[in-house]
Every structure is written in structure tokens, then in C-alpha cells.
Regions:
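Residue(s) in the substrate-gating loop at a strand-loop-helix junction
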Residues: 152
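C-terminal helical subdomain
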Residues: 213-307
Length: 307
């Protein structure tokens, strides 16, 4: 008996990387899987390469599982409706949506072109809306659904050159929280994973010029296997995770952590209110001891060891 016996999953962008590993492990645990991948490049360029999705489908079938390929784009709502319908027509229903589809177009903010901003927002944030909006009413009607959204520490903590990606990924956290709140009474859970893994996307990020930093990055990537992320996703997609809802998880190799939601770290009060001068003299010095370091998350995720 697998944890997902009798369940049907749609996995977007799953011809490569984390998505491919999750699709395969879901199938190994009994799920029937719609493997979606439009076959575009790492920046969203091109289209129509059916090889990535079909290859994962073939691997699943060779291992004794059930899967079908889908080549639609998460940027198009009609394509997402078609994914849901394909799951129902082929396998008789839908219970799980996993959302790793993504691209990168990294540039510093002052060099970011509007089209690069919009392309990344469309795939990540709008893509999450499209595929989950296409599935949510079915989930509500049947009183069961598992949604696993994909964010990133670039959104939670910030990262140089990724203002478009980070903005989309933090937006996904807010979207997931609201979807979880609105649908908890309907037997639906919605959680977020922030995976750190060696994939085509992470390899496209420029290597640091400093040799020490470059070597550390390479070692982190070497240890961050994409298949290490899959067990968490299978668990979150299962009935055993029915009481896990609205949470944000980070996983990297053997490390598994949960993030807290935004809340005040420190508060100061002044009778009669504040003036710019009293904020400068009293308010800000008192609050500053709780400031978050502007270090791209290094103080939160210091690095090795990870195993």
C-alpha cells in the first residue's frame, strides 16, 4: 500500500528537476500522475518540446506506475482547465496539485526590463493562481484536496538579481495562506515548500566571482539532490497530512524546517503618538535591536553541513 493509493495528481513543470522527482515518487506511492511540462527553456523561451514530460511518463510506466503527459502552459487558464479535465478523463478524478513550474530571468532591479518582470510573474504567481483556481471547485465539491505550492528563500529572505522571482515567490506564500484559510472546512489543505536543490534553474544562477564563495555554492548544490525534496511532497499530498495546513516548509538535503508567519518582533508605544523627531530619538533605536540582517538569508541558512 502506497501513501497515495487511489489518488490522482497534476504536477506542473515536472519534466525536469524537483517536479520530475516528485511526480515519480508520487507514482511509486500509488498516485496516477498528469506530468505537465510545456518544454520551454529555463527562461521561458521556445515551446513544444514534448521530450521532458514524455520521458518522465515513460520512466513512471516502466516502474509499474500510471502517468500521462500534458504540454500546456500554466500561464494560460484554459490550459490549466484542460489539465484538470485530462486528469478526470484519463484517471477518473483529481485530488492533488503540485506547482513547481518555473523560469528565471535574473537581473538587478535597475536593469530589469518590464517583459522579464512580467514573464516571471506570469509563470510563478499567475501560474499558481491558474492551475489551483482550475482545480479548487472540484476539490470543494468532493470535500478533499491537497495543494502544494512552491516558493523560495529568494522570496522569504531576498536574493540579489531576483526581484521578479522573489516578488512572485513571496506572493505565493500569501496566496497559499489565504487558500488554506478559505478551504480548510472543505477537507482541503494548502501548504508551501521552499526547496533548495540542484536543478536546471539553480544552475542558471551566476556563480560567485569569489573562489571561496563559488566553491561553497558548488558543494551546497552537490549535496542538494532534487530527489531529496520528493518525500515531503508525497507526505503533504497524503491523508496523513490532513492536519497540516497553511504552513511553509524549507528543505535542503537532510534538513527540514518550518517557517513562522509574519508577526511583530518588537513594539514600542508612546502616549500622544509620535513625531518624526521622537521616532528618530526613541522609536527607531528601540526597534532596531530586532531588525533583520540584510544578508540575503545567510544568517538564517548558514550553509553546511546539510546531511
Amino acid at each position: 500500500m502506497g501513501m497515495l493509493d487511489g489518488r490522482v495528481a497534476v504536477c506542473t513543470g515536472s519534466g525536469r528537476g524537483v517536479g520530475a522527482e516528485v511526480a515519480k515518487l508520487m507514482a511509486a506511492n500509488g498516485a496516477k500522475v498528469v506530468v505537465n511540462d510545456p518544454g520551454v527553456g529555463g527562461g521561458g523561451e521556445g515551446s513544444g518540446d514534448q521530450t521532458p514530460a514524455q520521458q518522465i511518463v515513460d520512466e513512471i510506466k516502466q516502474a509499474g506506475g500510471q502517468a500521462v503527459a500534458n504540454y500546456g502552459s500554466v500561464t494560460k487558464f484554459d490550459d490549466c482547465l484542460a489539465m484538470v479535465q485530462q486528469a478526470r478523463d484519463t484517471f477518473g478524478g483529481l485530488h492533488i496539485v503540485f506547482n513547481p513550474a518555473g523560469i528565471l530571468r535574473d537581473k538587478m532591479f535597475h536593469n530589469m526590463f518590464p517583459e522579464d518582470w512580467q514573464a516571471v510573474i506570469d509563470v510563478h504567481l499567475n501560474g499558481h493562481f491558474n492551475v489551483n483556481r482550475a482545480a479548487i471547485n472540484l476539490f470543494r465539491e468532493q470535500g478533499y484536496g491537497r495543494i502544494i505550492m512552491v516558493s523560495s528563500t529568494s522570496g522569504l529572505l531576498g536574493n540579489l538579481g531576483q526581484c521578479n522571482y522573489g516578488a512572485a515567490k513571496l506572493g505565493i506564500v500569501a496566496l497559499a495562506r489565504i487558500v488554506a484559510l478559505e478551504n480548510a472546512s472543505k477537507g482541503i489543505t494548502c501548504n508551501v515548500i521552499c526547496p533548495s536543490a540542484d536543478t536546471r534553474m539553480t544552475r542558471s544562477v551566476p556563480t560567485p566571482k569569489d573562489p571561496t564563495a563559488a566553491a561553497l555554492r558548488e558543494e551546497r548544490l552537490r549535496r542538494s539532490r532534487a530527489d531529496a525534496i520528493a518525500p515531503l511532497c508525497v507526505y503533504l499530498a497524503s491523508e496523513q497530512a490532513k492536519d497540516v495546513n497553511g504552513q511553509v516548509f524549507h528543505q535542503r538535503a537532510g534538513e527540514l524546517s518550518v517557517y513562522g508567519h509574519m508577526r511583530p518582533l518588537r513594539m514600542v508605544h508612546r502616549n500622544g503618538g509620535w513625531t518624526p523627531e521622537t521616532i528618530a530619538e526613541v522609536g527607531m533605536p528601540s526597534l532596531s535591536i530586532a531588525f533583520t540582517a540584510l544578508d540575503g538569508g545567510r544568517s538564517v541558512h548558514p550553509g553546511l553541513p546539510m546531511e
